[in-house]
């Protein structure tokens, strides 16, 4: 758990200007359980700005989003109407709360974040400070820690057909392979820099840039939507900026881990969709076929191994 500040609040001279309108914070919920309460509790220490938290709910059945509305001020439940996927749910919430004539939220930036995040002290303020240092930043992301305290490689290169494909296929079996190391920038110490893409688990997004590229690509139901977003922002002339002075903890997979086989298949579909979309030429077809076949083989191997483990456990 990230420690929260116990000392006195920052003085006025330490504070960045606070806009009159609240900052929109969009989190996509799907039966988030106790994670949501921890998310909202730690959010109080992330910034001195006024906030409006919108839960874009994809069909929760655990009552957690409704309980959060009752317990916390400035938290609203926005029902998407079904399990639309991560990027589509964000798009719907942004359209409803930011892109309307009567919008009451800040029009320059908004936050996209998973509900299983715990915020570090002043983390949102640090993201804003980073955005101020990088005027061309279309997205800004923090340092992300896993529950064991290790740093998650959330700032990465864009995946080329070979580098990204080999990472997806051999990464789970050969952890130290050179393609994964290059893709994840494993050998770089955390430093503020522009990168290929940032984890969508927590992003400060410039609204102008988001509108320019049409938001998240809704062809991605789950996985790779953040890779695609970062790539399209860069192609449109924006930067994806990693700001490790901002820090969060991410308890990954609270909902996606419920059906590993299904989620692996979804990840492979999204991986292939991205790589095929970026490499559409006829002369690249053999590589596309190879990657697709390798992903299918990996899926069969991983799912089969998982089923064998379950049978032995029973």
PLM features per residue range, with description:
Residues 80-105:
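Glycine-rich, basic loop-to-helix element that forms the pyrophosphate-binding segment
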Residues 41-50:
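Short, acidic, metal-binding catalytic loop of nucleotide-sugar glycosyltransferases
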Residues 118-153:
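Conserved donor NDP-sugar-binding/catalytic core segment of glycosyltransferases
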Residues 49, 57-65, 82:
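A conserved acidic beta->alpha catalytic loop
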Residues 110:
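Short aromatic/hydrophobic "clamp" motif used to bind/position activated sugar donors
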Residues 228-310:
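Active-site-adjacent helix/loop segment of glycosyltransferases
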Residues 159-195:
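Short, flexible, basic/aromatic active-site loop/helix in glycosyltransferases
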Residues 187-247:
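A short, conserved alpha-helix in the catalytic core of glycosyltransferases
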């Amino acid at each position: 758990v990230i420690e929260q500040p116990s000392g006195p609040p920052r003085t006025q001279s330490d504070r960045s200007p606070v806009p009159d309108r609240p900052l929109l914070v969009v989190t996509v919920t799907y039966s988030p359980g106790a994670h949501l309460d921890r998310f909202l509790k730690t959010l109080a220490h992330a910034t001195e700005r006024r906030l409006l938290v919108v839960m874009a709910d994809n069909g929760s059945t655990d009552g957690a989003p409704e309980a959060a509305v009752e317990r916390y001020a400035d938290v609203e439940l926005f029902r998407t109407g079904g399990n639309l996927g991560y990027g589509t749910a964000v798009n719907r919430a942004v359209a409803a709360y930011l892109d309307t004539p009567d919008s009451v939220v800040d029009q320059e930036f908004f936050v996209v974040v998973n509900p299983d995040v715990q915020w570090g002290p002043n983390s949102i303020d640090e993201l804003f400070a980073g955005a101020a240092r990088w005027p061309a930043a279309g997205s800004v992301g923090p340092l992300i820690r896993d529950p064991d305290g290790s740093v998650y490689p959330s700032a990465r290169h864009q995946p080329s057909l070979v580098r990204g494909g080999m990472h997806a296929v051999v990464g789970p079996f050969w952890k130290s392979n050179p393609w994964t190391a290059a893709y994840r920038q494993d050998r770089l110490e955390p430093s503020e820099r522009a990168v290929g893409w940032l984890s969508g688990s927590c992003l400060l997004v410039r609204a102008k840039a988001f509108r320019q590229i049409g938001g998240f690509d809704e062809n991605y139901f789950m996985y790779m939507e953040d890779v695609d977003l970062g790539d399209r922002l860069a192609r449109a002339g924006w930067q994806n900026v990693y700001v490790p002075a901002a820090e969060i903890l991410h308890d990954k997979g609270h909902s996606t881990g419920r059906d590993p086989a299904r989620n692996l298949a979804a990840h492979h579909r999204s991986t292939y969709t991205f790589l095929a979309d970026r490499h559409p030429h006829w002369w690249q077809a053999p590589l596309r076929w190879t990657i697709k076949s390798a992903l299918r083989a990996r899926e069969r191997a991983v799912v089969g191994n998982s089923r064998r483990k379950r049978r032995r456990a029973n």
